[in-house]
């Protein structure tokens, strides 16, 4: 399934949450007549598991994005817990403007309880045509998600098309605008998206953008003593540019982009441990988990 598979995993209070590609199946009776109908329909799904004595004793689905689709790209899907609520990003699966449609989960941030139910104070829970899990709309391919302990806010990274990657905040009931806007990017053939605007009044504006695209992926807000020079900086991975970069982030503004590592391969994931050590995952033929060391 191209970019599909296991998408993210999160441990919290003896539970794990896993986002992954769920195969919904197809209408096999039509396969011999229409080969395209043999493609499986898939959804971004989330399962919750219980850990006891370092063993997984249960694993059950708590969320399945709607509708299932056959497209095999732009899954996004990162997980974060804040105030005992689970936030998850759902990519737009190359469906474009459906991110503005309230009757689906495509291209959105969803917020659910740990059992998969929708919180009553979600922004659209009382709207008859909105799915109650929807928290934020208008995203393309949100690849990273992190909680900033300094301001208790959640932030994301998102892939633009040909340019327009961005770092921005998850804000209740807001709209990033895809694909009415492309955040400064264009389509892959160079044509404009929407009316060519990078941003419009009424939409949430990204905090920091990359033009051309670097395929920004995972992120953390670094807190630790192992690399004191990185404290309170945003650390981000890049697939296309194959870099680990840092941004200063103060008062809602990002600046001073600095390349920390370059040329190791497509950097997919970044994490830190309690000691402040930093680990990255390379999404390439030379895949593996690497630990950063001091010079």
Residue ranges, per PLM feature:
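Mobile, glycine-enriched helix-loop/loop "lid" segments at the mouths of ligand-binding/catalytic clefts
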Residues: 110, 169-199
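Acidic, Gly/Ser/Thr-rich repeat motifs that build Ca2+-stabilized beta-propeller blades
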Residues: 1-96, 146-160, 212-250, 273-294
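Repeated scaffold domains used in trafficking and secretory/extracellular systems
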Residues: 267-269
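Blade-edge beta-strand/turn elements of extracellular beta-propeller
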Residues: 1, 49-70, 105-144, 194-211, ...
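Acidic/polar loop patches that form or flank catalytic/metal-binding clefts of enzymes
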Residues: 118-121, 154-157, 175-181
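Short, catalytically relevant binding-site loops at active-site mouths
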Residues: 141, 161-163, 174-175, 183-187, ...
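Repeat-solenoid scaffold signature
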Residues: 130-169
């Amino acid at each position: 399934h191209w970019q599909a598979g296991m998408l993210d995993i999160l441990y919290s209070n003896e539970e794990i949450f896993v986002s992954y590609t769920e195969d919904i199946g197809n209408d096999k009776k039509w396969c011999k007549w229409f080969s395209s109908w043999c493609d499986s329909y898939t959804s971004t799904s989330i399962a919750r598991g219980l850990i006891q004595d370092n063993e997984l004793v249960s694993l059950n689905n708590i969320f399945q994005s709607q509708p299932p689709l056959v497209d095999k790209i732009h899954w996004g899907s990162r997980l974060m817990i804040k105030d005992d609520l689970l936030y998850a990003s759902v990519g737009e699966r190359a469906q474009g403007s459906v991110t503005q449609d309230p009757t689906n989960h495509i291209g959105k941030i969803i917020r659910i309880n740990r059992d998969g139910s929708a919180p009553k104070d979600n922004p659209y829970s009382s709207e008859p045509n909105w799915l109650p899990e929807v928290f934020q709309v208008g995203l393309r391919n949100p690849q990273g998600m992190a909680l900033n302990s300094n301001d208790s806010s959640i932030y994301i990274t998102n892939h633009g098309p040909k340019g327009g990657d961005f770092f921005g905040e998850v804000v209740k009931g807001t709209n990033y605008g895809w694909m009415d806007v492309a955040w400064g990017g264009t389509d892959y053939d160079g044509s404009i998206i929407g009316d060519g605007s990078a941003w419009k009044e009424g939409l949430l504006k990204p905090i920091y953008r990359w033009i051309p695209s670097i395929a920004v992926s995972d992120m953390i807000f670094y807190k630790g003593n192992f690399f004191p020079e990185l404290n309170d900086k945003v650390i981000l991975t890049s697939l296309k540019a194959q870099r680990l970069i840092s941004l200063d982030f103060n008062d809602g503004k990002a600046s001073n982009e600095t390349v920390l590592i370059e040329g190791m391969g497509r950097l997919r994931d970044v994490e830190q441990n309690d000691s402040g050590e930093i680990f990255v995952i390379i999404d390439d033929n030379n895949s593996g988990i690497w630990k950063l060391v001091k010079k």
